[in-house]
Amino acid sequence: MKKIKTSALIGLGALGILFGRKMPGVQVIADEDRIARYSAEPVVCNGEACSFRYVTPAEGKPVDLLLVAVKATVLEQAIQDIAKFIGPDTVILSVLNGITSEEHIETAYPGRTLWSVAIGMDATRSGRTLVFNQAGKIQFGERDGAMTGRVQAVADYLNACGIANEPCSDILYKQWNKL
């Protein structure tokens, strides 16, 4: 797997802000109405303004890594909205709570999903403002536990971004353990 250079995220709630602010050049996928709201009231994290590049689903071009951070209630719409951002080598990470989002994403985009779970953060969001003491980490891996080149590429990227992470050979256990 090649080095991850380009990224996008969908969902600018607590986890989207928490991780997205550390991803250089990340594209935040949102519809035009949401982009207008985000632009009118910029995101602030621990007192610092965050600058994001917003793009509509129609403007998408394939990226190396796509982070899905939406609420479960809008996952199906998000799966449609990310279509143009998915290429043959795109890796998708979902940080939704629960154990089913990866299955939904994998059904739509076979062979592109790494299973993952976000743990240990204490982020609180009020409007466009996020406050946290502990950023937590992303645990992730192949569903079958294999330590593949794409697992290593994601770990390298997250490390370069300063996002705590843990590649796992037992990611299904880690997901269930969070419950």
Model regions: which residues?
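NAD(P)+-binding Rossmann beta1-loop-alpha1 motif at the extreme N-terminus of oxidoreductases
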Residues: 1-50
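Nucleotide donor/acceptor-binding cores
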Residues: 4-6, 64, 136
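Short, charged/polar "capping" segments at the starts of alpha-helices
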Residues: 34-39, 101-103, 148
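Internal alpha-helical scaffold of NAD(P)-dependent oxidoreductase catalytic cores
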Residues: 85, 108-111, 127-179
